[in-house]
């Protein structure tokens, strides 16, 4: 079952997200997600198997320019994760479908996402979910 996540699910979301975004901590993610949930332009979904959380997705509405799109707002997949041992069961596809339905309900005509250039698993997932590649970029920074 896929369902919308609520404030009571913040601990579950933060723990799942920390498995994907290992550069962050559960506490930081809990705080960030708590702040994000107060905004109406973002939604989290949880995937449950036998009432056990096994995955999540985070989607948003983007009003700024999104690479390769032509409309505003654009639904955007900010993150998607399914625990090892529960993968290849179609759960990520279910989570994505929930995000797409949410975005469509919010008036979006396009849905977009991104992934790190070396994340082959994510690239393959996006291709399998009928995303088309719109661009590749390299980001730069320097200290001032």
Where are these regions (language model features)?
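A short beta-loop-alpha structural element at the N-terminal edge
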Residues: 1-13
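Active-site rim helix/loop that mediates acceptor-substrate recognition in acyltransferases
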Residues: 25-48, 58
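Conserved beta-strand in the GNAT
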Residues: 46, 52-61, 76, 81
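Conserved acetyl-CoA binding element of GNAT-fold acetyltransferases
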Residues: 71-84, 138-139
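Conserved active-site alpha-helix within GNAT-family acetyltransferase domains
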Residues: 93, 105, 117-136
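Conserved GNAT acetyl-CoA-binding A-motif
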Residues: 96, 103-115
């Amino acid at each position: 079952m896929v369902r919308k996540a609520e404030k009571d699910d913040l601990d579950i979301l933060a723990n799942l997200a920390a498995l994907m975004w290992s550069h962050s901590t559960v506490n930081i993610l809990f705080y960030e997600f708590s702040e994000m949930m107060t905004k109406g332009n973002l939604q989290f979904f949880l995937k449950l198997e036998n009432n056990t959380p096994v995955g999540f997705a985070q989607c948003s509405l983007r009003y700024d320019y999104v690479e390769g799109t032509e409309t505003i707002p654009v639904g955007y997949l900010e993150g998607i994760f399914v625990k090892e041992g529960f993968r290849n069961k179609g759960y990520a596809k279910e989570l994505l479908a929930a995000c797409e339905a949410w975005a469509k309900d919010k008036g979006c005509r396009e849905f977009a996402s991104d992934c790190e250039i070396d994340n082959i698993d994510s690239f393959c997932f996006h291709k399998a979910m009928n995303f088309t590649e719109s661009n590749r970029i390299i980001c730069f920074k320097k200290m001032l």
